[in-house]
Amino acid sequence: MTVMEHTKAATIDLTKHGLHNVKEVVRNPSYEMLFEEETRADLTGYERGVVTELGAVAVDTGIFTGRSPKDKYIVKDATTEEHMWWTSDAVKNDNKPINKEVWDDLKELVTNQLSGKRLFVIDGYCGANPDTRLSIRVITEVAWQAHFVKNMFIRPTEEELATFEPDFVVMNGAKCTNDKWEEQGLNSENFTVFNLTERTQLIGGTWYGGEMKKGMFAMMNYFLPLKDIASMHCSANMGEEGDVAIFFGLSGTGKTTLSTDPKRALIGDDEHGWDDDGVFNFEGGCYAKTIKLSKEAEPDIYNAIRRDALLENVTVRSDGSIDFDDGSKTENTRVSYPLYHIDNIVKPVSKGGHANKVIFLSADAFGVLPPVSKLTPEQTKYHFLSGFTAKLAGTERGITEPTPTFSACFGAAFLTLHPTKYAEVLVKRMEAAGAEAYLVNTGWNGSGKRISIQDTRGIIDAILDGSIEDAKTKHIPIFNLEVPTSLPGVDPSILDPRDTYVDPLQWESKAKDLAERFINNFDKYTDNAEGKSLVAAGPQLD
């Protein structure tokens, strides 16, 4: 075996990962080399990247254009049995158990696929704080997958690489599939599986890059809260005075838009931790949606798409131009790029002090929630566990009716511990830092229109500059929320949602309907004492 060194780091031995007769190891290659490798003329199928007019390479991830949660499994053993939030008949989630025998079969499949090949190895970090980060090693035979990992994880210095020992290994065998899946009781021939005792992730059958990124996020979500460190699916930014704000929200709530603020530096856009030193990014890059992207609407993301960025599943015309509006393959078109492709970021390390503002974003299509309300610690836990948003979905008769979404901790798909653990740790961190929490509705009200981005930005500004603390408040029944009666630069007539209806009884009827949905959803968290104690902090029906 030869090791092509692109650093001064020591030679690495892959036999300890079960790999044999490896022809060559290309470790932490430069972006220049990755560009040459992923665009080679002799590559075929999903391995080959196409150069676009913006300079970024575009790849096709095949039939998987998103994560495959039905194919996600975790080895149930002495390490995981007690703490893992396992799926059950009562509460379904993505943490499905497999035994060691099935794991061994899948590991043999992947190691056989990768053995005897020329391999790319990317060593990097998940977590900007050296005390709590995971040292990640990703092994793949596909150049663009190595590129994706180099973009998304934190890139080590040459000195760090010289003594690098992985805490967690990801072996990506995208080209192999499992023909024994039925007899093993699995969902399909494709798999994304984790063994926390061996600290290894195996991938087979899916080429989607996000399986590697979100796989490690799920692991951080397991290890950190057990050390009383918050692990969060959120964006974070920092003001000129060093004040830190974190934004939770599901897709479509404005998380990216509102945390990208010319007055504030970005810490990160998706995954963060909060420990004794403050808030820190898990990642060294961004993984942004590109559907309907335009330079005018989102200049930061558009300008980040240049050489070293990696596009997934976008339509590239024969002249190299990109049709960002084309969602025919998937609406989940993406681009990964290193964080430094964004100008206004926290440097040199993506971390800040303790957060003093925590913002839950919800796009309420029911027209019930106020545009902003300040939460008590118990309400903070309740709404964090609820993770509510709603969308307007057209029916066959052209009527639009709201569809609610509840996602625990605004990221249920990535949780590996019971959701109440994340709420408990978050509020503990907030109380120690004196942080305040706010529920911000970026959705609709009784006028039938969406709350304007100008009003929402005014609300966010009032939260961040503290002026909301000086506002007089009033009580909103059913949901038991305290709302300000006026804020600078915000239309006062929208702050009490009842005032946006011709008849306040309309609001009350809708509020009771939504409250019932909240109550029914929260019932699944009352299987422990912490969850039961929070019921009183949610909406109440007589």
UniProtKB/Swiss-Prot annotation:
GO cellular component, one term: cytosol
EC number: 4.1.1.49
Pathway: Carbohydrate biosynthesis; gluconeogenesis
PROSITE patterns: PEPCK_ATP
Pfam families xref list: PEPCK_ATP (PF01293)
Biological process, per Gene Ontology: gluconeogenesis
Localization, UniProt: Cytoplasm
Binding positions for substrate per the UniProt entry: R67, Y208, K214, R334
Keywords from the UniProt entry: ATP-binding, Cytoplasm, Decarboxylase, Gluconeogenesis, Lyase, Manganese, Metal-binding, Nucleotide-binding
Ranges that cross the membrane: none
SUPFAM superfamilies xrefs: PEP carboxykinase N-terminal domain, PEP carboxykinase-like
Domain of life of the source: Bacteria
The keyword Metal-binding appears for this protein: yes
GO molecular function, a single term: phosphoenolpyruvate carboxykinase (ATP) activity
InterPro entries for this protein: PEP_carboxykinase_ATP (IPR001272), PEP_carboxykinase_C (IPR013035), PEP_carboxykinase_N (IPR008210), PEPCK_ATP_CS (IPR015994)
Cofactor remark from the record: Binds 1 Mn(2+) ion per subunit.
UniProt: ATP binding residues: 214, 233, 249-257, 298, 334, 450-451, 456
Cofactor(s) annotated in UniProt: Mn(2+)
Binding of Mn(2+), residues: K214, H233, D270
Catalytic activity: oxaloacetate + ATP = phosphoenolpyruvate + ADP + CO2
Subunit description: Monomer.
Chain's role: Involved in the gluconeogenesis. Catalyzes the conversion of oxaloacetate (OAA) to phosphoenolpyruvate (PEP) through direct phosphoryl transfer between the nucleoside triphosphate and OAA.
Family note: Belongs to the phosphoenolpyruvate carboxykinase (ATP) family.
Protein name in UniProt: Phosphoenolpyruvate carboxykinase (ATP)
Species: Vibrio campbellii (strain ATCC BAA-1116)
Designated gene of the protein: pckA
